[in-house]
Every structure is written in structure tokens, then in C-alpha cells.
């Protein structure tokens, strides 16, 4: 499938800023089942950009803008050819060994409730692949999905206790439970083409990957209860949202900041 992504982020400031520094994790890599045909990052003002890779192997772009700046728009766009590989991820730039993804973070720390859920599923599913599928569907059944953009920095234990959240919450809970069982798991950010849903979205999508013996890294979209197929564009990975967030950075200047995001995921010609 060919998927076109147009991801626009607009920052507006109540007072002009003297300098902006942004870290962008918005460039998808090519690997088995995903081929980036074209990709670009455009800024509506003079800026300096430097591209490299981070400690997870993600493509990152550092953006430097000198002021005065009261508004800036960052547009990421491109076309990606995808194939359905039933969630199995191969051919990626793996900088870290699987065991590195056993580390817990403040966003993926498992409390008693998440530990109990994980142990319950482990008792009824001896095989790792079936265990992970069961974990995905059980979390989905216990959580109510919220549309719109939530708080991606909410801890997994808080979201699980409240019983609702956005895709980032679902991925964090899954990672917390899997790691508690000694299964390497990681957070994934990217885009989802919705065949019967709106093309324009308010944020990027998020899911998780877990290490399965004899298969390798395998994706689980907990919010939708499926393994990623050719409707998914995989962009960045990390231990949690902080490590794979599309944008992060700092600004030099006073005043308030307002951010608007518009993501269009479509097929060419739509």
C-alpha cells in the first residue's frame, strides 16, 4: 500500500522568542515491509537543521531557529510503501539488544494492578506469542479509548486505574505488563491509515512491540486490538513516549506557548 503523510505542527507564542531548539523524530526508516519513497521537512522561516540517529536508531533532526519568533510551522510530508508482514518487524537498525527494553521508566512502571493482570494472563497462556495477544486484547477490553489528543506523559498505572486513555496510554500499559513478565517491550510512534475513518487526525498514532522468540520484534496495536499491517507507517521507537515523541525541545523567551497539530494520512490521489 502507498500511504501519504502530511504532518503539520504550528507553534504560536504570546511574546516573541529569541531562539527555538527542537528535536524531531518524524522521519520514518526503510526496512522489510516499509520503503520510504520520499520524505521532507519544511519550515516556514529560516532555520538550521542537522540530521543524525539517536541511541535507539531513530532518525532525528535537530532544528535551530533564531528569533524573534512569534509563530512557526513545521511540515513533515512524504510517501511510504508498506506491506503486511503480520506485525513482525525485520530489517530494522537495531542499536540495542532486546534485553535493553526490559528497563522500566516512570511512564511504564507496573503497579500492583498491572502486575496482577500480567500474572493472570501468564497463568492461562504458557506460550509467549499467545500471551502477548491475550495481553493486548485484555487491556483493550478493560480500557475505554478516548478520541482526541490526551496527555502522553500520563503514567501507565494512572491510566489503568482510571480505565480510559489514548493510544499512548494503551502502549505504556502493555509495555509495563510485558516487562514485568520479563518480556522485552518497546513503545512505537507512527501513523495509521484508517480505511473507514477520518483522514485528518489530531495526533500521531502509537502502539508497542514485544520480543518473541523465533519471530523477533512483533507489533501490537493495543488501542485497536490488532497487529500492525500495511496501514501502518512506523516512525520511531523507545522505552516510552518521551524517547519516541515526534517533537520535543526548548525555547528562549517569556510568554505563553500554543501548539496545534494536524495530521493527514491518506492514499495518493485521495
Regions found by a protein language model. Give the residues of each.
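Short capping/connector residues at structural and topological boundaries
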Residues: 18, 70, 106-107, 150, ...
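Secondary-structure boundary elements
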Residues: 80-84, 96-165, 173, 239-241, ...
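Structural beta-strand/beta-sheet cores of well-ordered domains, especially the beta-sheet scaffolds
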Residues: 1, 7, 22, 39, ...
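A broad, low-specificity signal for short, low-complexity segments enriched in glycine/proline
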Residues: 1-4, 32-41, 146-148, 166-172, ...
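Flexible, active-site-adjacent loop/turn segments at secondary-structure boundaries
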Residues: 11, 15, 24, 29, ...
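Hydrophobic/aromatic-rich core segments of domains that either
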Residues: 137, 169-255
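Linear, non-domain "peripheral" regions
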Residues: 1-119
